[in-house]
Amino acid sequence: MESPPHPLLLLLTLLVAAGAASAGADDLVAELQSLRSRSPSGVIHLTDTSITRFLSAPAPRPYSVLVFFDAASLHSKTDLHLPQLRREFALLSASFLAHNPASADLFFADIEFSESQHSFAQFGVNSLPHVRLVRPEHTRLAGSEQMDQSHFSRLADSMAEFVESRTGLEVGPIVRPPLVSRNQMILLVILFLVSIPFLIKRIMDGETLFHDRRVWMAGALFIYFFSVSGGMYGIIRHTPMFITDRSDPNKLVFFYQGSGMQLGAEGFAVGFLYTLVGLMIAMVTHLLVRVESLQIQRFTMLAVMIIGWWAVKKVILLDNWKTGYSIHTFWPSSWR
């Protein structure tokens, strides 16, 4: 009968195994940091092989990984906003790295469907956009935590809230690149200083755009059209001009039935009808009254009423089709 292993030998074996595991984890962290340093935004591009190496390592791992799932073939689908979300994800990574340059607790990565279909299947991803947080204790990729769609609403800022609430790490303010670079700003200032004498002369002579009433008229029309077409709503909500029909990918949808969403095309269509009526009223009150021919005035007024009735009818029908609400006519009681 063999004697049991000596306790000292068993302890030594366990220490060697723990040291090897620690060294392996340190090697993974060092490799991730090296890959991160090669990326301008700090986002590490992973494939099936690297996902197995970094995310299937024995738990608990000393790091978490936030993974963005991408598909280049779907970038043309404007309703998914994949290119924009990918840029915001890169901003999130760069901002975290700017505020935590030496952090090895969280890494940002992306994978592409055509290169890593096996990993998509392991995560159980079947729709995009999709972001997963793989924490140190996760032993299965499918068991990682999915970012809710609501965290895409404010782009990088809402993604940062998800990261901070799930990891306890502070991302810090999102660092966005300036619209104008330093050299461009210097050039603009120089051009402005050089043009000051010429601007003063044109202002004194009354030859600027601000002295042209046609410019003010065009600006007023643009503001009116922009307001009635829901342009500000489209900018705030990032609504697309149109979407692809789910039942027929080759068909485009310009009018969305339902009050929960408005496409840019339908807003512009309604804005055009409103602007058309406004222009006709302006023409009648400012131009038609100067026409001396009574027949031309009557014919023009009849045409304006017909076109105005058609435009208002189209707006009412579209509103009824979209929201389900109907507009009823109420006559004065004395007319009944």
UniProtKB/Swiss-Prot annotation:
It comes from the Eukaryota. Residues 205-215, 289-298 are cytoplasmic. Its main location: endoplasmic reticulum. The keyword Transmembrane applies. It is found in: Endoplasmic reticulum membrane. Pfam families: OST3_OST6. One of its GO terms (biological process) is protein N-linked glycosylation via asparagine. It is a multi-pass membrane protein. InterPro entries: OligosaccharylTrfase_OST3/OST6. The keyword Membrane applies. This is Probable dolichyl-diphosphooligosaccharide--protein glycosyltransferase subunit 3. GO terms for cellular component: oligosaccharyltransferase complex. Coiled coil: none annotated. Residues 26-183, 237-267, 320-336 are lumenal. The gene is OST3. Residues 1-25 form the signal peptide. Component of the oligosaccharyltransferase (OST) complex. Belongs to the OST3/OST6 family. The chain crosses the membrane at residues 184-204, 216-236, 268-288, 299-319. Keywords: Endoplasmic reticulum, Membrane, Signal, Transmembrane, Transmembrane helix. Subunit of the oligosaccharyl transferase (OST) complex that catalyzes the initial transfer of a defined glycan (Glc(3)Man(9)GlcNAc(2) in eukaryotes) from the lipid carrier dolichol-pyrophosphate to an asparagine residue within an Asn-X-Ser/Thr consensus motif in nascent polypeptide chains, the first step in protein N-glycosylation. N-glycosylation occurs cotranslationally and the complex associates with the Sec61 complex at the channel-forming translocon complex that mediates protein translocation across the endoplasmic reticulum (ER). All subunits are required for a maximal enzyme activity.
